[in-house]
Amino acid sequence: MRSIIIASLVALALASSPAFERTFEPKTDYHYKFDGLVLSGLPSASSELSQSRISARARIQAVDDRYIHLQLVNIRMAASHLPESEQMPSLNSMEQRELSEEYKQMLELPLRAQLRNGLISELQFDKEDAEWSKNMKRAVVNMISFNPIAPRNEIEKIESSYDKEEQSEENTSFFTNEKTLEGDCQVAYTVIREQKKTIITKSINFDKCTERSEIAYGLRYSSECPECEKDTELIRPQTVYTYVLENEELKESEVRSLYTVNVNGQEVMKTETRSKLVLEENHSIKSHIKKVNGEKESIIYSSRWEQLVEDFFKNGDKAEFAPFEKFPLDKKMHLIKTITEQIQEVENNMPETSHFLARLVRIFRTTSTSQLKEIHETLYVKADKKIQSLMEHALAIAGTKNTIQHILVHMENEDILPLGQILKTIQETPFPSQSIAEALIKFAESRVAKNNLVVRQAAWLAAGSVVRGIVDYKNIRPLVREDKRELKEKFLRVFMQQYKDAETTYEKILALKTIGNAGLDISVNQLNEIIVDKRQPLPVRKEAIDALRLLKDTMPRKIQKVLLPIYKNRQYEPEIRMLALWRMMHTRPEESLLVQVVSQMEKETNQQVAALTHQMIRHFAMSTNPCYQRVAIVCSKVLSFTRYQPQEQMIASSYAQLPLFLQNSFSGAQFDFAAIFEKNSFLPKDLHASLDAVFGGNWNKYFAQIGFSQQHMDKYVQMALEKLESLEKESTTVVRGRRIQTGIKLLKELAQKMNIRARPATYTEKDAFAMVYLRYKDMDYAFLPIDRQLVENLIEKFTSNGKVQFSEIRRLLNQELEFETHHAAYFYEAIRKFPTTLGLPLTISGKIPTVISAEGQFSLELEGTELRLTVEARPSVAATHVYEMRMFTPLFEQGVKSVQSVRAYTPIKIQAVAGMKRNFEIVYKVVVPENQKSIVSLTTRPVVFLRFPGFSKFEYIEAEERTVVVPQWQQKTQEIEKVFNFLGLEVSTRGNILNQHTLENWLLAEQDFEVSVENKNRPAEFTARLTVGQLEKTELSQIKYNKIFEKEFELEQENTESRREYFNKMVKNIQKEQGYKSVISLKLEAPRDYTMNTELTTVCDKQVRMCQWEVEIRRSPILEETKEWTLRSQLLVVRPEMPSSLRQLRDQPHREVQLSLTSTWGSQKKSEVTVNAQLQQSKEQKKYERNMDRQFNGMPEYELLIKAARLNQINAVAEYKLTRETEQVLARYFDLVKTYNYWTVSSRPENNENDRVVVQLTVEPMSRQYVNITMQSPMERIELKNVQVPRVYLPSIAQRSVKHQLTEASGSVCKVQKNQIRTFDDVLYNTPLTTCYSLIAKDCSEEPTFAVLSKKTEKNSEEMIIKVIRGEQEIVAQLQNEEIRVKVDGKKIQSEDYSAYQIERLGESAIVIELPEGEVRFDGYTIKTQLPSYSRKNQLCGLCGNNDDESTNEFYTSDNTETEDIEEFHRSYLLKNEECEAEEERLSEKKNYRKYERDEEQSDEYSSEETYDYEQENTKKSQKNQRSQKKSDLVEKTQIKEFSHRICFSVEPVAECRRGYEVEQQQQRKIRFTCLQRHNRDASRLLKESRQQPLQLDDYPVSFVESVKVPTACVAY
């Protein structure tokens, strides 16, 4: 039964075909009424639209079963601005438009069409017909092209679905592919039969097209954003056909198409086309339509005209056809002359100026080479400077082959001067072609370019950018894939030849930047060869990595395949690896690749590489950039599984992102910053700061980027500065030279004794290179190379015969010139064209024509010690953003556009004077000229426009424009009109401006806002005078302190009196000493006798223990004030004495920092506030010091002292008397803080003292990332608990100077203790030290500066002797009678004389010896050598390693040979002589040598930061020599047991094996536990503290006792 039904359906389908083929009966003349309507406007029902209607009678003659003829007659046109309606407006309701006879005759030419299965398959037109006319006729026959019969595959689907549902015989629906006017796309048919009438509906799926006449220009600068594509599709076309048949005869055909522009998912513009064919009559043929025999063409819209225009733009006069030759030259010249005259009529740049620029660009694009030559000779040569400059830039913006060739010819003749600017504009040509690229390359090799490095650079970079446009995958025709391999190979050969011919680093980098701008995918292998070739200079290899940036979208996996091995290979330089990671992350890698990156990070030996990797992945994980959504999720996932924690370093490679994106919006910006450091340089190796922009889902990667890169330049600059420094008196040079030579001799003799081979520098002067580069729209725009030759030229210029030439410096600093400059540009231009169902092309374009001008005078004068700068300028700028949908045809032009214009004109005069007489003084003066107006205006408006005819050969036709006012958007603006006098200047603000700022609002709302500043009196001067006084001696007795303590500051009641007495005595002793005073004043003056004076007076003692700052500000009354406004404020800070030992810290009664602030301010009414504050230690921090029940000495004591002396709590009491307004403002700000921390705030009402606030702020001392704040106001008590903040720096009252803090934080440290050494690169190993000197660290360069040696005082002792050879001095130190004894060149020195020898005491029993770079700390048992992180990379030797940031190559022997044998390594640095015994037995025992892996790093050295194994620190006691190694492998921790609702802690610490060790022996012990509810705040606090140190819980009740197995010995396998 089923097969019979299916066969019947097939037979029915086949039977119906002939009937359908006879829709048009042969030998019959059909007369249809054709109506077409175009609507352009905003997507608002209430707004007006520009509407154009075309009406005609369409005669269709069916010659036979296959062919029809079509002719349009009685063609009429009308157009008006009308509100939208569903019905097609009548012709009488619109303004009638005249059609020229030429165009009417063109439209009346007939066509011949072939019908196959109801579809138009072939078309033939008259040979005289024009392309635009053909396309309009295609639109008519397109309305009769349909085939409602399902194809065979659809019939098979009917069979497969028969069992599932019944099929209606009347109604069918199916999909098929079909050629229509808009392309070869998938269409959906729905057929509904109603008695005698059949209604057929057809719609087009534009996402599934194989052919479409679409063209795009200027899109090559955007990157792919896959996450944005679905939600931010910019253009959404919709087309629906409706056919009505009666008795198989076509009675009516209608097609409606809607084309919308969308921003952030909202429609902002639309163009709609409606076409309708209605059968009026049919009869036998009486007069035949002329048969045409033109070439056979497709029904798909013909873009031949667009292709001819494009070919002309790209190839110029060599194009096959000149599409604009009909337009006479004299008319073009007349238009150009008219435009330039209109520009000149306006004194300053106005919004119209930018429109005139756009018109100039359009005209120049239509010109031939001969026409440009005539324009140049007739108009350009005779024009003034501004017009000439605008014409030059307009030619470059036009970007056609003819305009570019014209510019290049005149550049070679040196007729055009701003060569670099013009070439930069050519980089952005929207019509890149092979001929343009070849012309640029030819110019780059010309004489002019070779003589001017700036021009040569600009030409090559422009050539690369043009090549990118040619080969870019974002094709001009999206659905057409051209094979461009031959072109790619040709240009790659040219660029690689440029690279091979390069002789300098700069030339090689220029060649690579050219390749990078070109974005050639076939260049990957060549670039990879350069990256891995270590013979190439490092800057060249880095640039080769950067040259891969444009391939991240086209071949991300290939880039990852190239860069991942480079990142993972530790043999490559760290900066190469970090740049490889940087580039790889921008390919949006998959999880599988990121897992490998994280794995490498966890085992990475280079701290800089590991730190940058962690920061980069972390910031990508937090990114809100919509284009990185997938990457952010993956980065978060892989980061959650890593155990890696970056070390705290002050100078570390870093990466940061600042994404600024609105939620649920695909627009915003992202700022990226990256810095790459390495140990051989104190300057960053690379710095990048970039801005990415996303507008409506269009991603502009590297919209702007500035960067700095250098290699060895810091070394060379340092050498150059030393050369300048050497220009001293001859005698001084001789003496100093002798001393240096003596010191070097000592160090070289030591090297000879120990057979140390000098480590030559890995760089030479010629390797020094640096560059600053600018990147715009992902193109290398310009870069400035800085090499050895440039530095030498500068030195040579300003020195002569060993002396600085001050005359040259004065000549440089005494200049006077006048300037006039004009610049024009398109900040972007993007064009998309596609067909509509009326046969008219729709163009969607955007551009920002901008004109900038500035003229004035500049002078620089140097007189004695005074430098004077004067700039008088009159800058003006006009920019207009035009975004439009435009329907263009010779008959008419119609569309809608959004226009945003900005204009600014600000005449100004600036004077700056800097001088040093008695005081240092800077005077900065801004002068507003009299009778001149400064204006900043903003105008935005949506506009619909009509132009009839579309263009004329003989004149420019103005468009009929109408501003569209949409009430719903006007409600989002506010009217402002205000005029007021500000400091003698009349300021007026007028117009309306948006109060809700979104991109769509800016496109749709009408705004007209202007701010003007006018000076009608004499020139208005605004002066700022900064005076810095000299340091003067003063008496400290003038500092008064009265009530500085509050009752809330009392820490322990029983010690209050002694603490007060101690503090008062300390202050009185300080006041007896000499004080110093400095005064800084700032005076501001403005017209109308407005002044503001600020004076800051600082008084401090010599050691900065007590300081007082006084600020006094006075200013003239403003607004409603009637009296002078004043502020008087005094801040007193007293810090406690600096303890030198833990014992002194414990015994010191006063260890807090006291602050007292008194301030009074106001005009008629005064506000007063007095704040007393105390910076102190919290209870938790004090507990840290109290738990230290052992005696420490030397460096362990000092380091513990620093931590124990940290202040982590502030108590402040404020008594105030405020005005009502001030009190309300402060209350609002505090409410904001409470709201922001809503979940962590608790408050309760209290009745406290009026006009008094008590605040306590406590920083959690261990992690330093959580803050508790308690505030007590007159009416309430507020608490903020556990507020997370960035890691806080806690001051320590025992801290050394800022200089030493920086050295500690940013330097590399090597530590030697007992028989254990931790190297500069953080490698920990054991080696036996003996009574013979071992070389700890030495400068092993060819000109050494220091050496550090050490030996044991005697066998089996832990005490050591240190010897430091520093230049010409030999310093020996050792511990004797619990005090460090120091000898310099064999002579004992006393501690009071240390400073003369650059030695400093550290605590009570340690010293610091300064080195030429860094320092050495010694306490008799431990040696810590601290060097700057950049110091002597690969030129250090000794047991501390080479300080190269790599932990895998530490063991280089004295003869510079790498070894894995630690014994061999140690013996090479052993200095044997008759004074010592070598202890061969200890040196030969292998058990004395061991290298620790990372997991075993906690050994018997004391650990860093918060955890501290006190048991290992008391190195003074003799019993330490018998302490077993197994015991040292134990550590005590608080044992924790967690349950569902409670957490239990062991009351006393329990022994555990260290990480990396396993239990060897154990015993049962009964352990007491105390339990707390899990929700208890103390529970979470104790849980956190237990991770840092054992807890003391003796005061807590015992909850239960449990038997626990406790290890007594551990072993490492």
UniProtKB/Swiss-Prot annotation:
Keyword Secreted set for record: yes
Vitellogenin domain sequence ranges: 24-687
Gene3D superfamilies the UniProt entry points to: Lipovitellin, beta-sheet shell regions, chain A (2.30.230.10), Lipovitellin-phosvitin complex, chain A, domain 4 (2.20.80.10), Vitellinogen, superhelical (1.25.10.20)
Subcellular location: Secreted
Pfam families per record: Vit_open_b-sht, Vitellogenin_N, VWD
Biological role: Precursor of the egg-yolk proteins that are sources of nutrients during embryonic development. Together with other vitellogenins, may play a role in modulating life-span, acting via induction of autophagy and lysosomal lipolysis.
Protein name: Vitellogenin-2
Organism: Caenorhabditis elegans
Gene: vit-2
